[in-house]
Regions:
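Extracytoplasmic/peripheral linker and loop segments enriched in polar/acidic and small residues
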Residues: 363-369, 423-432, 457-525, 548
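Gly/Pro-rich hinge or "lid" segments in bacterial periplasmic/extracellular proteins
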Residues: 81-85, 159, 170, 176-245, ...
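Append "and occasionally in soluble cytosolic enzymes with long acidic Gly/Pro-rich linkers
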Residues: 311-413, 500
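Ligand/substrate-recognition segments at binding pockets and active sites
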Residues: 227, 373, 379-450, 491, ...
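Ligand-site clamp/hinge motif
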Residues: 237-282
Length: 548
């Protein structure tokens, strides 16, 4: 199985192009015509990237599957190109003031929504202020807008205080309270997509649940939506670059069962699947349609620090130290993940242009690849539970896809070795993320794939008021370090603050890193070409072309 080095990829660019494995094994029998057969003469690419999404409202989504769908149907001010560089999106150009506090974006002339109505700079004012609306409760609000003037007043309820303005229909101006070295990356982030005020005010939260009301501005727009079956996105004729979109649409098959996806792929019904059955990995490694590539992100465990005994950091540390990360990633997960020694892993870039993890902890990993059983037992004893005595049976919650159940069963065995009994609760995907976000768990499977390469994107997750802080980790010292990283103009001071924050997080076991992500998928290139994959875990279909 060929894999690519994220270190090399991220040093040059933040995007990777697909590389497969050489083999002469039999491939699926699908053809371009069979893939598009259900839609007549239209060139429809049939794919699977996940089950029914929890949401595809750009302001509310925090999942990769939903993000992949939003990516096809919306376009931000800026985008990431194939080389991982920031490129024009709806904005054809932009300027930054000398002090780094004012960004002026010039929109393309004649932009339209998918329903044909004009899209103007005022739509961005509305959309960005909506992200701050406490009634919307956007999980990314603090991450993407806390550096904008008036954010504190906006998040408290007066969204008009967020200092963004539209001097005219094609000019959008953002005023920052402090310089942000990665703000251009935020302007390319899906949460800050423009959304249409008319459709949201007319339909409320339901606007993002049906083809009739899901108005967008990207290369594709939703034309059919059958919940738990499929979402059909067709080429958006009102997209500014529609003439360069080669396919007529994308059919997202909403399949949660990886075996069902695999069968549909092998039968030729689907040309691309993200969810590959883990039991098939060994037999797929030599196939030239099986791809494995690194992405920036970490598979980790959230521990609910608001519940006993997890409010005791020694309990959390014991659970973390008892994990053999090398065995888990390389044996049980068959090398499709990499063992994590840190929370912030490969691909995240430090202020000096080197990889952040190489400068952490004196250049050494915080965790050894193997379990530290004696250290785990000592931590458990320090917590007042020698050999697990007096500790109640704990519950680990996860959804049942990919390796999640495998990880859960391993944790049962690993933690049993230090005297900790564990029950596993399997939760369907539709219920899992809301449950986790609401804190209705003890221990839960979690993970984060980068939205941009700055390490703050990972470390902000554990800031006490962050909407994605599922374990409710709360350490004022940690918060101060994150706040310093947001406001300082000194790159060295910023780097030191972020490194100290990670050190504190690891010492507190505020969460438990398990493995670094790779993406693995099946893609039939006898049917489709032009799909490209980014280091942020997204597949881009706007350049796709059906063969034949």
């Amino acid at each position: 199985m060929k894999t690519r080095s994220l270190t090399l990829l991220m040093a040059a660019a933040m995007t990777v192009s697909a590389v497969g494995c050489s083999s002469n094994d039999t491939k699926p029998t699908s053809t371009a015509s069979s893939t598009a057969a259900a839609t007549g003469d239209k060139k429809i690419l049939s794919v699977q990237i996940g089950p029914n999404p929890e949401t595809i409202d750009p302001a509310l989504n925090s999942a990769v599957d939903g993000g992949n769908m939003i990516l096809q149907s919306f376009e931000c001010l800026l985008t990431n190109d194939k080389e991982g560089k920031i490129a024009p999106g709806t904005a054809e150009s932009w300027e930054v003031s000398e002090d780094g506090l004012t960004y002026t974006f010039k929109l393309r002339e004649g932009l339209k929504w998918s329903d044909g109505k004009p899209l103007t700079a005022n739509d961005f004012v509305y959309s960005w202020q909506r992200v701050c609306d406490p009634a919307v409760a956007a999980p990314y609000a603090e991450t993407v807008l806390s550096m904008v003037e008036g954010y504190d007043e906006a998040i408290a309820g007066d969204i008009t205080k967020l200092n963004v303005e539209a001097p005219d229909d094609t000019t959008f101006v953002v005023h920052l309270s402090n310089a942000c070295p990665y703000f251009e990356s935020l302007a390319a982030f899906a949460t800050l997509s423009p959304v249409q005020k008319d459709t949201i005010e007319a339909n409320g939260d339901a606007w993002a649940t049906s083809a009739e009301t899901y108005v967008s501005n990207g290369p594709f727009h939703v034309t059919e939506w059958v919940p738990n079956s499929y979402i059909l996105m067709e080429k958006n004729p009102n997209y500014w670059d529609a003439e360069n979109i080669k396919i007529d649409g994308i059919k997202f098959n909403l399949i949660e069962d990886a075996n069902a996806s695999y069968n549909a792929y092998n039968s030729g019904e689907i040309a691309f699947i993200k969810d590959v059955p883990t039991e098939e990995i060994a037999s797929l490694k030599d196939r030239d349609d099986f791809f494995v590539e690194p992405i920036i992100g970490t598979y980790y465990i959230s521990v609910n620090t608001e519940k006993e005994p997890f409010n005791n950091k020694d309990v959390r540390r014991a659970l973390s130290l008892a994990i053999d990360r090398d065995y888990l990633a390389n044996t049980l997960m068959q090398g499709t993940y990499s063992p994590s020694g840190n929370f912030v892993g490969p691909g995240w870039m430090d202020t000096d242009g080197t990889e952040f993890y190489k400068n952490s902890n004196g250049g050494e990993s915080f965790y050894t690849p193997e379990a530290d059983i004696e250290g785990a037992k000592a931590a458990l004893e320090a917590a007042g539970y020698p050999n697990g005595e007096g500790l109640p049976t704990l519950t680990y919650s996860t959804n049942d896809s990919g390796y999640h159940k495998t990880v859960a069963e391993y944790l049962q065995q690993a933690w049993k070795e230090i005297g900790v009994n564990l029950d596993v609760e399997i939760v369907e995907w539709a219920s899992f993320t809301p449950m986790r976000r609401n804190g209705d768990f003890e221990i839960a499977r979690n993970g984060w794939v980068g939205d941009y390469s700055d390490p703050s994107n990972m470390l902000e997750l554990l800031y006490s008021t962050n909407g994605n802080n599922d374990g409710k980790y709360n350490n004022p010292e940690y918060d101060k370090l994150i706040e310093l990283s947001r406001t300082t103009l000194d790159p060295k001071e910023r780097s030191e603050a972020l490194h100290k924050a990670e050190e504190l997080l690891i010492d507190d076991a505020g969460c438990i890193p398990v493995a670094y992500y790779n993406d693995f998928w099946l893609e039939n290139r006898d049917v489709v070409t032009g799909i490209w994959h980014s280091a942020y875990g997204y597949w881009h279909f706007e350049d796709a072309e059906l063969v034949g």
